[in-house]
Amino acid sequence: MLATFRTGIEKFIQSHAKPVEKYGHQPRLYALTRHIGADLKYDDDVVFAAAWLHDLGVFVGHRPEDPAELASWDHVRYACDCAPQILQDTGFPAEKIPAVLAAISEHQPQDSPTSIDATILRDADILEQLGGIGALRTIAKVGRDTRFSTFTDAVKTLRKNLEALPGQIRLENTKRLAEPRIAALRNFLDAVESESAGALF
């Protein structure tokens, strides 16, 4: 049953993740949760499901395309609304579904997680916004996301992430994992500043 529902969830997300690079976030995120939670007691089934389903609402075909609607779109609520049926269809243990929804609802940096499962997921998601991966994920949105019309928009977000996110990490394992990512993102932004010569646009 374990392999069945995990495979089912992975296949569902792989078929729905659009643009295609959105898919990589899920397996990377889950791998990070395993490193973060290596010496912690938590429910790996809950974290697995939440890691794979938490961003369903940002996929093309699930999010609204109208810019006005998109500006007020709550992708977390959408994921929480859709997740129960997906989990049921894949044979996920019904008694664990509420914990998955709680973890999804508390996974963003501004949230205050109320369980170890949610804390691990939130910390992992912060790591995905730092380092080389964080830079790639943000830059890939330029010209495709209404928030990112230019490289300047992307760099502003990356600088904000570098300044704000490290201090929001909760767990010691995550803090250690964050160190090289923080350094990598800082080096990248320094290089952009020195190479752009005031003409980044």
Which residues fall in each region the model found?
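An amphipathic alpha-helix signature
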Residues: 2, 6-10, 30, 76-84, ...
